[in-house]
Amino acid sequence: MKILQVQFQNRNGHTLRGIVTLPDTEGKVPFVVHLHGFAGSCSGYKSMYTHLSRALAAQGIGSARFDFYGNGESDGEFEDMSFDGLHTDAQDIFAWAAQQPYVDIVKLIIEAAIASTAFFNVKFLSLIIKYKG
């Protein structure tokens, strides 16, 4: 498995930082984007996204997990984040993932409640949303 520290600039010029976990295979792979909740981090509650990313890589599936603006290692302060900011950050993360050479865009899966509204402005061939309610 390969673990990469990644970052990119969102549409507001802030740096979002995250972690990509890839299987040892070459070429494009099915890919999951994990999005944490309002006050979370890219590791998830009790490191659930870390554990899930490793389990997915063992099955040949890559994944990315980012800290939203104002959370974790990304730019900004928590008190400056907003739901609109979460929405646009999610869109920017989806767009970033779709441009990566290792992502099979046909098999890009978004996992988060916020994703249910954020993906509408990003064009994907296939999208599955998991909602825990």
Q: Where would I find each of the regions flagged by the language model?
A:
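N-terminal cap/lid segment of alpha/beta-hydrolase-fold proteins
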Residues: 1-27
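Feature marks short, surface-exposed loop/turn motifs that line or immediately flank catalytic pockets
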Residues: 24, 39, 70-72
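Short beta-strand element of the alpha/beta-hydrolase
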Residues: 28-37
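Polytopic alpha-helical membrane proteins, predominantly small-molecule transporters/carriers
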Residues: 36-38, 50, 64-69, 90
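The serine-hydrolase catalytic nucleophile loop
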Residues: 42-53
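Conserved alpha/beta-hydrolase
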Residues: 53-73
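Catalytic nucleophile-loop/oxyanion-hole region of alpha/beta-hydrolase
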Residues: 71-105
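Primarily recognizes the serine-hydrolase "nucleophile elbow" in alpha/beta-hydrolase
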Residues: 92-133
